[in-house]
Amino acid sequence: MKFAVLVFPGSNCDRDMFNAAIKSGVEAEYVDYRETSLSGFDGVLIPGGFSFGDYLRSGAMASVAPVISEVKRLAAEGKPVLGVCNGFQILTEIGLLPGALLHNDSHLFISRNEELEIVNNQTAFTNLYEQGEKVIYPVAHGEGHYYCTDEIYQKLKANNQIILKYVNNPNGSYDDIAGIVNEKGNVCGMMPHPERALETLLGTDSGVKLFEAMVKSWREQHV
């Protein structure tokens, strides 16, 4: 398995994503936002940061980068796509995930560890966790308030697309939502950073299982 780790001007978690993939026992390669082909890749990791300086709004300019058409193609083919923080914002901007990310209710940038609950462990991203398991991931965002219409929210609930919730909501997200998947279950977006939660020495290794779950799910289908 080989992941494409996208790199935009202003990305600052691409190395963490790369490290998470390698730590999971698979290959990874940095891919510039101007690239027009993702042939040869089995999945996409869209890192956090401030793509294009967050001008216009977070993820807006990245959403029209040349590589995005290939991200959409891989997603349509059922390949795993994970967007974290700014990556989540990009996924909502390009329509692969519903809803939007707004400014935190506090209007402050939040950077700390947060306790989260796995509320759906039947996905390619969470199947190594226990249902209801509590995990610790770092958060680092100013626009992490997940918002959607009531209609979209009811659809998310009906399809079991909400996979991760905050235990103590730090940003005002609708129903404490921290992470969701698309209807097919192969595209995931979350504001917390599992790629920064790989070592107990650094405070938490709760994120290891997420990347291992992605690899496990892919291998079950392809090996």
UniProtKB/Swiss-Prot annotation:
Transmembrane segments: none annotated. SUPFAM superfamilies: Class I glutamine amidotransferase-like (SSF52317). One of its GO terms (molecular function) is glutaminase activity. GO terms for cellular component: cytoplasm. Residues 3-223 form the Glutamine amidotransferase type-1 domain. It catalyses: N(2)-formyl-N(1)-(5-phospho-beta-D-ribosyl)glycinamide + L-glutamine + ATP + H2O = 2-formamido-N(1)-(5-O-phospho-beta-D-ribosyl)acetamidine + L-glutamate + ADP + phosphate + H(+); L-glutamine + H2O = L-glutamate + NH4(+). Keywords: ATP-binding, Cytoplasm, Glutamine amidotransferase, Hydrolase, Ligase, Nucleotide-binding, Purine biosynthesis. Pathway: Purine metabolism; IMP biosynthesis via de novo pathway; 5-amino-1-(5-phospho-D-ribosyl)imidazole from N(2)-formyl-N(1)-(5-phospho-D-ribosyl)glycinamide: step 1/2. InterPro entries: Class_I_gatase-like (IPR029062), PRibForGlyAmidine_synth_PurQ (IPR010075). It is found in: Cytoplasm. It holds the Pfam family GATase_5. Its main location: cytoplasm. It comes from the Bacteria. Coiled coil: none annotated. Its EC number is 6.3.5.3, 3.5.1.2. The active site is at C85 (nucleophile), H193, E195. Part of the phosphoribosylformylglycinamidine synthase complex involved in the purines biosynthetic pathway. Catalyzes the ATP-dependent conversion of formylglycinamide ribonucleotide (FGAR) and glutamine to yield formylglycinamidine ribonucleotide (FGAM) and glutamate. The FGAM synthase complex is composed of three subunits. PurQ produces an ammonia molecule by converting glutamine to glutamate. PurL transfers the ammonia molecule to FGAR to form FGAM in an ATP-dependent manner. Part of the FGAM synthase complex composed of 1 PurL, 1 PurQ and 2 PurS subunits. This is Phosphoribosylformylglycinamidine synthase subunit PurQ.
